[in-house]
Regions:
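Blade-edge motifs of beta-propeller repeat domains
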Residues: 37-70, 87, 101-123, 157-176, ...
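Beta-strand-rich domains and repeat architectures in extracellular enzymes and scaffolds
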Residues: 64-95
Length: 428
């Protein structure tokens, strides 16, 4: 799932286990989101709520050391040696990256610089992601620097005290047009690799792959294996969702395209991808914005929920249809599944997670009219719980998830141009 959200593990994560065992095992991902640039909560067990019907999000913005702060991007991370979710924030001008350390009930410490390198940096930080790249237990920073004509990757490693520093090998050149990066294990060796993409990559070769894949050698050093691992792709990539879609135990890629056909790339087991779009996806032309995955019908196959600005009327099942599911019929073969409960107006983000601890995926959808919360009951059944479950403020551009109070349930931080909010998941 594209944002790291709480949802029962899919068989892509634990091979050879039944759904029942999955439900009692690990309980964390990652949509949404995550899809691109996603915050990964570090949940180590599956929490099952005693009273799921009592769940709601409560505003806890007063735990933050600021009332108003213009935010370009944020991610939860493990910045120090405790297990609480800390917060990394990039300011609106994209010039300063700050770390807010979580002090539990005392709230977050006042913003501190991410390190000497970030203080001395003169280039704009176009985008950043967080992940443990060298397997030392602390999340590192992956930055995209500079203008789109000449982007660069800079990796800053964490000393596990919230201080981030570069290594000599931590800076790499990127293809012009690169905009985002998602840390994900593509070759199945347990290390986070880096998947880069953009809306329009200006490659120097005739094969426009529109992505870059940097494989982690195991110690936080990377090798560019794009030409070996990725097929040629058309321009227009907006986002990507990683999950085991064909049931072989390794992560595949669902690419979200603007104004065109979305793409499905299947992993051969060692990180080489082939385009299976024509044989495995229904033809649907739409203006897609985001996608996330979950096993909605609990048949062991990962399904997809796609949100869009619009769908070409030829592919709508009912008037006003804007968002839809792709139901996995097995082996990574999908069919469109409509559901009239989904919002019928332009939507920009979707996050799938088990918000109320009943072992069914719920959905948060960011739309032109605000945030919607859909409670899942399984077998494609949902109810609109927006008014009951969410605080009044419901206008976000993006959301990230983390465990603020270490209760094993996901809390969230959301922001827009107008404001930001911290919501804590409660059961009372």
């Amino acid at each position: 799932m594209k944002v790291c959200k709480l949802i029962y593990q899919k068989k892509s994560c634990l091979l050879g286990l039944s759904i029942t065992k999955l439900i009692s095992g690990l309980f964390f991902i990652l949509f949404v989101s995550a899809c691109g640039g996603i915050s990964k909560p570090n949940i180590t067990r599956n929490p099952v709520a005693h009273n799921p019907s009592s769940q709601s999000f409560r505003d806890a913005t007063d735990l933050l050391p600021f009332e108003k702060f213009a935010i370009a991007q944020a991610n939860f991370l493990l910045a120090n040696q405790d297990s609480s979710s800390d917060l990394a924030i990039l300011n609106k001008s994209k010039s300063k990256l700050s770390i807010l350390l979580n002090q539990g009930r005392k709230g977050f410490l006042k913003k501190i610089p991410a390190g000497q390198w970030t203080q001395n940096n003169k280039e704009k930080i176009k985008f950043f992601a967080t992940a443990d790249l060298n397997n030392d237990g602390g999340d590192d920073l992956i930055l995209i620097l500079g203008a789109s004509e000449n982007p660069k990757m800079q990796i800053l490693f964490n000393n596990k005290k919230g201080y981030f520093y570069p290594k000599e090998v931590g800076k790499y050149s990127l293809i012009p047009g690169i905009e985002k990066v998602i840390p994900v294990d593509l070759d199945g060796d347990g290390d986070r690799d880096l998947f880069y993409f953009g809306n329009m990559l200006k490659a120097s070769t005739k094969k426009y792959r529109q992505t870059m894949v940097w494989i982690n050698k195991g110690d936080g050093n990377f090798e560019n294996l794009t030409s070996l691992l990725m097929p040629a792709l058309p321009a227009g990539i907006r986002d990507a969702s990683f999950a085991d879609y064909d049931g072989d135990g390794v992560k595949d890629i669902f690419l979200v395209y603007e104004k065109g056909q979305n793409k499905l790339l299947i992993n051969n087991g060692v990180g080489k991808f082939s385009d299976r779009t024509s044989s495995s996806l229904p033809r649907i032309l739409d203006d897609s914005m985001h996608a996330d995955w979950a096993d909605f019908d609990r048949d062991g196959d990962n399904d997809i929920l796609i949100v869009n600005r619009s769908i070409h009327k030829k592919y709508r099942r009912y008037s006003g249809e804007t968002n839809y599911f792709l139901e996995n019929k097995g082996g990574g073969n999908f069919r469109k599944r409509s559901n009239k409960i989904l919002p019928r107006f332009p939507s920009q983000k979707v996050y799938l997670f088990d918000g109320n601890g009943n072992n069914h995926p719920d959905a948060l959808i960011l739309t032109a009219k605000g945030v919607y919360y859909f409670k899942g009951y399984g077998k494609w059944q949902f109810s609109d719980e927006t008014i009951r479950r969410l605080p009044r403020f419901k206008k976000f551009d993006e959301i990230i998830f983390g465990d603020i109070n270490q209760d094993k349930f996901l809390d969230l931080f959301g922001w827009s141009r107008q404001a930001s909010r911290l919501w804590v998941n409660r059961f009372d």
